[in-house]
């Protein structure tokens, strides 16, 4: 599929907080299993209570992504 930096991708990993969400590929590292770093607009639930802080990125395998 050859995903590259800057591509818009949809997340297929069902257990992911961002399942079926669209994000932007921030980097691709071919040496590891989860080598595609994807950046999202919304944060996940790991922020401290009462703040909007949280993770904006997560790593995925290329097989867990579809081009959007």
Curated annotation (Swiss-Prot):
Gene3D superfamilies: 2.30.30.50. Its main location: membrane. GO terms for cellular component: photosystem I reaction center; plasma membrane-derived thylakoid membrane. One of its GO terms (biological process) is photosynthesis. It is found in: Cellular thylakoid membrane. InterPro entries: Elect_transpt_acc-like_dom_sf, PSI_PsaE. It is a peripheral membrane protein. Keywords: Membrane, Photosynthesis, Photosystem I, Thylakoid. It comes from the Bacteria. Stabilizes the interaction between PsaC and the PSI core, assists the docking of the ferredoxin to PSI and interacts with ferredoxin-NADP oxidoreductase. Belongs to the PsaE family. This is Photosystem I reaction center subunit IV. It comes from Prochlorococcus marinus (strain MIT 9313).
């Amino acid at each position: 599929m050859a995903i590259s930096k800057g591509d818009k991708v949809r997340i297929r990993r069902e257990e992911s907080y961002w399942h079926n969400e669209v994000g932007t590929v921030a980097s691709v590292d071919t040496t590891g299993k989860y080598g595609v770093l994807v950046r999202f607009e919304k944060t996940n639930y790991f922020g401290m209570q009462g703040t909007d802080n949280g993770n904006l990125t997560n790593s995925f395998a290329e097989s867990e992504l579809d081009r959007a």
